[in-house]
């Protein structure tokens, strides 16, 4: 499933993005953020993080540096 989402983003980067002017307000760009989110966190959390990021990418948000959060260790240490 993760590879399907990565393929969609890569298709966008290769065929759609070059035809539009650069408008992303963030670094890394939303498509690069999405790739990294899927690679680090898998399909479900990567999809959630990418959707949240795309919803923030609008003219009323200041943008800036917004890296993908690190994967947290889910194990409880005792």
UniProtKB/Swiss-Prot annotation:
GO terms for cellular component: plasma membrane. Keywords: Cell membrane, Membrane. Pfam families: YidD. InterPro entries: Membr_insert_effic_factor_YidD. Its main location: membrane. It is a peripheral membrane protein. The keyword Cell membrane applies. It comes from the Bacteria. It is found in: Cell membrane. The keyword Membrane applies. Could be involved in insertion of integral membrane proteins into the membrane. Belongs to the UPF0161 family. This is Putative membrane protein insertion efficiency factor. It comes from Bacillus cereus (strain AH187). The lineage of its organism: Bacteria, Bacillati, Bacillota, Bacilli, Bacillales.
């Amino acid at each position: 499933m993760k590879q399907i989402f990565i393929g969609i983003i890569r298709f966008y980067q290769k065929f759609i993005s070059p035809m539009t002017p650069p408008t992303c307000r963030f670094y890394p760009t939303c498509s690069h953020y999405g790739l990294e989110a899927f690679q680090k966190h898998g399909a479900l959390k990567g999809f959630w993080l990418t959707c949240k990021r795309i919803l923030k990418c609008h003219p009323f948000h200041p943008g800036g540096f917004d890296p993908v959060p690190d994967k947290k260790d889910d194990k409880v240490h005792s």
